[in-house]
Amino acid sequence: MTSLLIINGPNINMLGKRDPSQYGELTLHDLETLICEHAEQLKITTKCFQSNHEGSLIEFLQQNSEKASGIILNPAGLTLNGYGLLDACIDSK
């Protein structure tokens, strides 16, 4: 069965609370629920994870990437300087 890792970086846990006019009213839980429900219809399993700490994101990626068919990563605030996370992504081929 196809499986996806859904990984979200810093401050994504604040969706729905932080400036709804810019980020919307859906919470991270709401989005994860929508993703998981849609994936289930496609017979895809999902494993969602969010952290505000780059090291935790790297550990999750390293511990789970070999079992996953694919990875969807929103690095959020780490987009510009998350070199450790980038290296972990490259190594997760």
Predicted segments, located by residue:
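Extreme N-terminal starter segment of soluble prokaryotic enzymes
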Residues: 1-5
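Active-site donor-nucleotide binding/catalytic segment of nucleotide-sugar enzymes
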Residues: 12
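Glycine- and acidic-residue-enriched helix-capping/strand-helix junction motifs
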Residues: 15-29
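Loop-to-helix element that buttresses phosphate recognition and phosphoryl-transfer chemistry
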Residues: 27-41
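Helix-adjacent hinge/juxtasegments
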Residues: 41-90
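Basic phosphate/pyrophosphate-binding loop/patch that engages nucleotide-derived ligands
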Residues: 93
